[in-house]
Amino acid sequence: SLIRYYSYDDILSVLNTILFEQIKVKTKKQVFISIGESGKSGDSMLYIVQQILRDKGLYANNIAEALKKRINGTEDLVLVDDFLGSGKTTSDWLKEEIINPEYGKELNDMIAEGKVSILSIVAMDRAIVLMSKNFPTIQVYGERGNKAFLHSGSVFGGSVTMIAYRELCYKYGAMLCPKAPLGFENSQCLIVFSHSTPNNTVPIIWSNKSIGNKRWTPLFPRFA
């Protein structure tokens, strides 16, 4: 399948590899916090991380709480979400957090010192580029992804086939999601998780809106 579907077991496997082989949680305790507003996909990810690490990590619901949980000031912060598509949402959220009058300076200092990282299941190349530009000291962990409709290296093969699929996705995507026919911020993703489908994925995969008087039946719903 050209759709990258991550089952719960796949997610556990990816996170285990990153946590123990890349972040190396056994050698140092970190404070894990979900990215963005409460109730978003980051919360689901944070819960899974808790199930994996148990008391090997510390966990917080927001930045203010996370900073208070740094017992001796040595713990790093790991910001958690399932997916980084364009990187804009995460970057904008961080920009707001670092100007918070209560804790912004402390967070900004930690970022400058390389004490903040991001954990995701998948991070698109363009998200990594944007984060590197706006926050060069933040390491982004996650499997790499790229746009589906590239002229070189597309998952659909050569340009002729790729263009045909792109036109198909755009035609129906424009009816289902006029502002983002190929996914949020033109992400052109084919990513699906067992718990949800990112809106960066092309809408023909997840939308259940109607075209005319016929409702579109998604292959995978936006939320499981």
Annotate each PLM feature:
Residues 1-224:
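PRPP-associated nucleotide enzymes
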